[in-house]
Amino acid sequence: MTEELTPKQAAVLEFIKKSIRQRGYPPSVREIGQEVGLSSSSTVHGYLKKLEEKGYLRRDATKPRAIEVLDNPAGEKVEFINVPVLGRVAAGVPLLAVENREDIFPLPVHFTGSGEFFMLTVRGDSMIEAGILNGDMVVVRRQQDAGNGDIVVALLEEEATVKRLFKENGRIRLQPENRLMEPIYAAEVQILGKVIGLVRKIY
C-alpha cells in the first residue's frame, strides 16, 4: 500500500501524470521545478526519491526522464523505449549527421510503434511548412526505403538532410517544405529512415 503524500509531493506527482497524459513522456527535472515552485534541481530529485520510496514512482537514475508512474488509477501501464539521440541533421543545406549517441530520450511505445528508432536535432528552416522547425527533435524509424511524399532523413554524399522524398524519372528529388528553397536532385541517395514524429521544447 502506498503512503500518504504531502501537498507538495502530490503536486509533483500530479504534474508528472499530466505530462505523460498530454505529451506521452515525463517532464524534465527543470520542468517539474518550474511547475511546482522548486528552484533547486537537487530539491526536485529529493521529492522524486520520496515518491519512489512511497511506491508512487519507479525511476532509472542513469537515464533522463525515465520515470514510471505506479499509482495509475486507470490501471494502465505505459511502456517506454529508450531512443538514442544521434546528433544533428540539417533541414536546410545538407549537414553531416554524426552517428554518435549524445543522449537517450524515453518515448512511449504507443507513440513510436514497432521498429528501431533514433532521434536527431533539426538545424535549419527548410521544413517549416511541414511543421518541422529549427531546434525540433525528429523521431526517425530506421528503414532503407520510403514511399513518395514521405519525410525522410537521407544521406547524400556522406551528409544527412531531412526532406520530403520523391522518386521520379530515374532520379530522386529531395523536396524542402519551404517555398523559398530549391529541391535537391540526385541519381541515388541512401535513406537512413522515415520521420514519424517530433519532440519540441516550448520556451
UniProtKB/Swiss-Prot annotation:
* Key words, A-Z: Autocatalytic cleavage, DNA damage, DNA repair, DNA replication, DNA-binding, Hydrolase, Repressor, SOS response, Transcription, Transcription regulation
One Pfam family of this protein, by short name?
Peptidase_S24
Q: Name one GO molecular function term.
A: DNA binding
Kindly indicate whether the keyword Iron belongs to this entry.
no
Uppermost EC category: hydrolase
- Gene Ontology terms describing biological process: DNA repair; DNA replication; negative regulation of DNA-templated transcription; proteolysis; SOS response
Q: Which InterPro entries does this one have?
A: LexA (IPR006200), LexA-like (IPR039418), LexA/Signal_pep-like_sf (IPR036286), LexA_DNA-bd_dom (IPR006199), LexA_repressor (IPR050077), Peptidase_S24_LexA (IPR006197), Peptidase_S24_S26A/B/C (IPR015927), WH-like_DNA-bd_sf (IPR036388)
* UniProt-listed Enzyme Commission number(s): 3.4.21.88
Active site: residue positions: 126, 163
In this chain, the site described as Cleavage is at 91-92
Residues annotated to bind DNA? 29-49
Which transformation does this protein catalyse, written as a reaction?
Answer: Hydrolysis of Ala-|-Gly bond in repressor LexA
Domain of life (superkingdom):
Bacteria
Q: Which PANTHER family match?
A: LEXA REPRESSOR, LEXA REPRESSOR-RELATED
Q: Which family does it belong to?
A: Belongs to the peptidase S24 family.
Q: How does it assemble?
A: Homodimer.
| HAMAP family recorded | LexA (MF_00015)
So what does this one do? Answer: Represses a number of genes involved in the response to DNA damage (SOS response), including recA and lexA. In the presence of single-stranded DNA, RecA interacts with LexA causing an autocatalytic cleavage which disrupts the DNA-binding part of LexA, leading to derepression of the SOS regulon and eventually DNA repair.
Q: What is this protein called?
A: LexA repressor
